[in-house]
Curated annotation (Swiss-Prot):
Superkingdom in the source lineage: Bacteria
NCBIfam families cross-referenced by the UniProt entry: PRK00481.1-1
Keyword Zinc in record: yes
Alphabetical keyword list: Cytoplasm, Metal-binding, NAD, Transferase, Zinc
Ligand binding (NAD(+)): A25, T29, R37, Q100, I102, D103, H118, T185, S186, N209
Protein name, as recorded: NAD-dependent protein deacetylase
Boundaries of every Deacetylase sirtuin-type domain copy: 1-237
Record: active site: H118
Taxonomic path: Bacteria, Bacillati, Bacillota, Bacilli, Lactobacillales
């Protein structure tokens, strides 16, 4: 790990042509969405949070699963400066985004090709008939009005495998980057943190976080709130 200055980090973001962002829940806290493991996070005070987001809970205690998942929705949350600047870089073909987040804020900010590695809360479907169901309907009932099947969000639960398409797209995004920027994540959840092994030998890793990461590879570290850095970033056409 090597520390860098805020000015250096901003310069890299402003000038690099092939950036891939690996993002986590920490980038959405400025939008009012709590992260998972901080003191104010979603899991605080809840016993067995992983169980509540597991396939077993969905199948055996669907009501308990449903009541917990509903607390993860923040439909009034708006993208912040981090999402907005990343979307701008994506639209200029300079940035790609692979996100652990299921809050949909990257897409809300205008990102078209974000890889939702763990899925999206705002995409729901009926497990019985396969129909797409508006998330607004899901928040009213987890039973499909047409067939009475169980509705669920299209997110990856504990005990479930990830989408092959998401994995392939994420690997491609990392492998094509000259600069990989890790933002708002402790980078400890597998297989998300394993994506870094697909980077080019010449690619640079930059972590913008409030605590250092445990990476086996050399990386540059800026201890900062990401929203502060992205607010200072000027992107020229």
């Amino acid at each position: 790990m090597q520390d860098i200055t805020q000015a250096e980090a901003i310069h890299w973001l402003a000038t690099q042509q092939k950036i891939t962002f690996l993002t986590g829940a920490g980038i959405s806290t400025a939008s009012g969405v709590p992260d998972y493991r901080s003191l104010k996070g979603v899991y605080q005070g809840i016993q067995q949070p992983e169980y509540l987001l597991s396939r077993t809970c969905l199948k055996t205690e669907p009501e308990k699963f449903y009541q917990f998942v509903k607390t993860l929705y923040h439909p009034d949350a708006q993208p912040n400066i981090i999402h907005q600047k990343m979307a701008q870089l994506e639209q200029m073909k300079r940035g790609k985004i692979v996100s652990q987040n299921i809050d949909g804020l990257h897409r809300k900010a205008g990102s078209q090709e974000v890889v939702d590695f763990h899925g999206n809360l705002y995409e729901c479907y009926c497990q019985t008939c396969g129909a797409t169901v508006p998330w607004q309907d899901y928040l009213l009932s987890d039973r499909h009005a047409d067939c009475h099947g169980q509705i669920r969000p299209a997110i990856t639960l504990y005990e479930e495998g990830l989408s092959e398409e998401a994995i392939e797209k994420a690997i491609q995004a990392v492998a094509s980057a000259d600069l990989i920027v890790i933002v708002g994540t402790s980078f400890q959840v597998h297989p998300f943190c394993d994506l870094i092994h697909y980077k080019q030998p010449t690619a640079t890793i930059l972590a913008i976080n409030q605590t250092p990461l445990f990476l086996q590879q050399p990386y540059y570290f800026l201890e900062a709130k990401a929203e502060t850095i992205f607010a200072e970033l000027t992107i020229k056409e």
